[in-house]
UniProtKB/Swiss-Prot annotation:
Keywords: 4Fe-4S, Iron, Iron-sulfur, Metal-binding, Oxidoreductase, Periplasm, Signal
EC number: 1.12.99.6
PTM text: Predicted to be exported by the Tat system. The position of the signal peptide cleavage has been experimentally proven.
Cofactor section: [4Fe-4S] cluster
Residues annotated for [4Fe-4S] cluster 3 binding in this entry: C278, C290, C296, C299
Taxonomic path: Bacteria, Pseudomonadati, Thermodesulfobacteriota, Desulfovibrionia, Desulfovibrionales
Residues reported in the UniProt entry to bind [4Fe-4S] cluster 1: C50, C53, C158, C196
Localization of this protein: Periplasm
InterPro entries per record: Cytochrome-c3_hydrogenase_C (IPR027394), NADH_UbQ_OxRdtase-like_20kDa (IPR006137), NiFe-Hase_small_C_sf (IPR037148), NiFe/NiFeSe_hyd_small_subunit (IPR053622), NiFe_Hase_small_N_sf (IPR037024), NiFe_hydrogenase_ssu (IPR001821), TAT_signal (IPR006311), TAT_signal_bac_arc (IPR019546)
Listed GO biological process terms: anaerobic respiration
Similarity comment: Belongs to the [NiFe]/[NiFeSe] hydrogenase small subunit family.
Molecular function (Gene Ontology), one example: hydrogenase (acceptor) activity
Organism the protein comes from: Desulfomicrobium baculatum
Protein name per its UniProtKB record: Periplasmic [NiFeSe] hydrogenase small subunit
Amino acid sequence: MSLSRREFVKLCSAGVAGLGISQIYHPGIVHAMTEGAKKAPVIWVQGQGCTGCSVSLLNAVHPRIKEILLDVISLEFHPTVMASEGEMALAHMYEIAEKFNGNFFLLVEGAIPTAKEGRYCIVGETLDAKGHHHEVTMMELIRDLAPKSLATVAVGTCSAYGGIPAAEGNVTGSKSVRDFFADEKIEKLLVNVPGCPPHPDWMVGTLVAAWSHVLNPTEHPLPELDDDGRPLLFFGDNIHENCPYLDKYDNSEFAETFTKPGCKAELGCKGPSTYADCAKRRWNNGINWCVENAVCIGCVEPDFPDGKSPFYVAE
């Protein structure tokens, strides 16, 4: 089976029409990603979060995570899935950052705490020249790695916009990657892939599109981003306008409880103010999505969770 890289990227771009990577993967894609081209070096770091974004990626279907790791990216560092740990793992991470200086993707999962000099999130330890242990904060890690990266991808809403760790009442000074970049005057390409958690297709598709641009910028321009730094490829659709219950809304047929049929707008659905292709792409291998049995809580938006609270409304 033969498939060129150009054809592969076109297939990935079919996400606009609701066809995701998980629906179009076949053996030819492996050939396209490996024939005559290097895999994208990736360093994945974790700050304040629940690891849900990593879990979502690990649940990718067609391609499965095995194929993503073996054929699409070169995952050099990931605290959850890598075999090494402790000082050895961090040492490897810094070695990779130097080896691929200016040519690796930095994926950031979780918010960055800045209060108390960032000590609310210690990501590991290193040894100095005298053999003394040095605790590395998430703040320090991003300061060290981001300027050396080719581009940074903020994976998940906590990383992209602050999310739950930065919600009202937090004492850790949690910040999004973009706010941290602004404070530290870090000028690197930043792409936000929000979601609580993001869909696997959004993460893999963004990396594929970005890496294809690196390999051939003439043929593959960077995906267009919206004002909030999100790829319109995945975040250009309004949930409400693509909802299967839209006709119920237009006819004022509103559900009174979650067990009753009808539009759930009066139960707190945030679909009208939320932009993502969830209605087309769906979740869990295309089986279902949030509005199937609950409501959209607007998890991909910059004002989540405070601006989307309460999630449910009793009418």
